[in-house]
């Protein structure tokens, strides 16, 4: 006899589930049953030996269970805490200059083109498709200063089913490429229009995020007004901080009355428990303490930090100060759109800091796996909704098949002893790519393979 009033189930999976908790950086749950409700939430995750009990409780038949192959596994969707959707148009090229020169020569001219909404639609459609195919179920996007094309990005992410924050970029100081700039009044007015229109559309999983580019491109007035907009509407905030030594020095010269880079944001109401700041390579212990006190987060972007020769973020130091942190691809300063690349680079950067005796230990692959999933969800304030397979959270997940057609991974007899081994999981994280990601789910809905409607 079924229990009364139980909601219908959209999915019941049996197999291996790999996720993180705050006490365990990588937990491998073999031969488990996971149920997803019609609303996309996880309603049970228990050992398969409990099938009979669960079937009675949730009214399902054995034929409704989808059994994974012994080499397949589910892991949480990857969370990209920092990506410039507009820069995808030149990703994989033009990374031969340090940050400030790179912005002037390549980035601002490329972003200027997004006043053309046809061009914007092509680029944004491709970047959302590409990131979803590569397992990014949640993305925190920078768009450009153009409101209409930024709204288009929100529409496209919603259409494809990706969970996202979308930000219209704000900047009123840009002497190096003056064609790509706003007045203070324009920036505030257009941000208010952007936020208002996005909120009116009532997307289920796409939200606006207030986006001052960085302190060098925003006046104090603009930053203060943006902080007020975020406070009024209870919105998230994203920007950049302490990415490159020249940038840090330039901020000091532009804003000499502030204690440091963090103080510029803090005094202008931009450092809150809904703020995520990219990079942070040169933050002092004093600044990290302020991040902790405010509840602000850091997006660690190792590919970009290396590719533009910006610096190394000491993640262990960030964690020591109990600051929330996730990973970001930072396309196109980071040339890869794949969060798997971000995982690999984060491990390498941590190893470099160990080699150089900055730290006495390195981050493990398991710890970085947690940063890319649960850590990223926490950095974006979504850890109550996504990030792992805890009951009550939404089912944001990717199905991994290490033996997929044309897989870049070779598996051997020793990789399997009845159940999937941790070696296979490691091989995917180090060697795998989108060919191994067979299905992607956001909020319980399968979004990859793509439906014919998109």
Curated annotation (Swiss-Prot):
Q: Which CDD domains match?
A: GDEase
CC cofactor note: Binds 1 zinc ion per subunit.
User: In the record, what terms sit under GO molecular function?
Assistant: guanine deaminase activity; zinc ion binding
A GO BP term, please? guanine catabolic process
Q: Which domain of life is it from?
A: Eukaryota
Q: Which cofactor does it need?
A: Zn(2+)
Q: Name one GO cellular component term.
A: cytosol
- Specify which residues bind substrate according to the UniProt entry for this protein: 84-87, 213-214, 240-243, 330
The metabolic or biological pathway listed in the UniProt record of this protein is: Purine metabolism; guanine degradation; xanthine from guanine: step 1/1
The record's EC number reads: 3.5.4.3
Family membership: Belongs to the metallo-dependent hydrolases superfamily. ATZ/TRZ family.
What the protein does? Catalyzes the hydrolytic deamination of guanine, producing xanthine and ammonia.
Q: What is this protein called?
A: Guanine deaminase
Q: Which organism is it from?
A: Pongo abelii (Sumatran orangutan)
């Amino acid at each position: 006899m079924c229990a009364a009033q139980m909601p219908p189930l959209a999915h019941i999976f049996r197999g291996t589930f790999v996720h993180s908790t705050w006490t365990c950086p990588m937990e491998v749950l073999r031969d488990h049953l996971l149920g997803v409700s019609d609303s996309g939430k996880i309603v049970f995750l228990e050992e398969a030996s409990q099938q009979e009990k669960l079937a009675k409780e949730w009214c399902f038949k054995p034929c409704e269970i989808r059994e994974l192959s012994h080499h397949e596994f589910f892991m949480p969707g990857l969370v990209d805490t920092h990506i410039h959707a507009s820069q995808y148009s030149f990703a994989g090229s033009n990374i031969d200059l340090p940050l400030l020169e790179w912005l002037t020569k390549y980035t601002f001219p490329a972003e200027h083109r997004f006043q053309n909404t046809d061009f914007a639609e092509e680029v944004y459609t491709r970047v959302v498709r590409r990131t979803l195919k590569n397992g990014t179920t949640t993305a925190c996007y920078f768009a450009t200063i153009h409101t209409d094309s930024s709204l288009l990005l929100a529409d496209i992410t919603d259409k494809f089913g990706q969970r996202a924050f979308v930000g219209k970029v704000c900047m009123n100081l840009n002497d190096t490429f003056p064609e790509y700039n706003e007045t203070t009044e324009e920036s505030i007015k257009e941000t208010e229009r952007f936020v208002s229109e996005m909120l009116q559309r009532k997307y289920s999983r796409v939200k606006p995020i207030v986006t001052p580019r960085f302190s060098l491109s925003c006046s104090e007035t603009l930053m203060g007004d943006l902080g007020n907009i975020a406070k009024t509407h209870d919105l998230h905030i994203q920007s950049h901080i302490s990415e490159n030594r020249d940038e840090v020095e330039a901020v000091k010269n532009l804003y000499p009355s502030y204690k440091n880079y963090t103080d510029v944001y803090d005094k202008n109401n931009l450092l809150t428990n809904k703020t995520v700041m990219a990079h942070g390579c040169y933050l002092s212990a004093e600044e990290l303490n302020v991040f902790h006190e405010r509840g602000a987060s850091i997006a660690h972007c190792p590919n970009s930090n290396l590719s533009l020769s910006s610096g190394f973020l000491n993640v262990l130091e960030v964690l020591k100060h109990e600051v929330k942190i996730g990973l970001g691809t930072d396309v196109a300063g980071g040339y890869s759109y794949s969060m798997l690349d971000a995982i690999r680079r984060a491990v390498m950067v941590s190893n470099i800091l160990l080699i150089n005796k900055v730290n006495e230990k390195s981050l493990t692959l398991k710890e970085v796996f947690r940063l890319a999933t649960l850590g990223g969800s926490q950095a974006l304030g979504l850890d109550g909704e996504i990030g792992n397979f805890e009951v009550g959270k939404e089912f944001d997940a990717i199905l991994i098949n290490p033996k997929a057609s044309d897989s870049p991974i070779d598996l051997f007899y020793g990789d399997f002893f009845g159940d999937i081994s941790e070696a296979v999981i490691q091989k995917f994280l180090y060697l795998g790519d989108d060919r191994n990601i067979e299905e992607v789910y956001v909020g319980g809905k399968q979004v990859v393979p793509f439906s014919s409607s998109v």
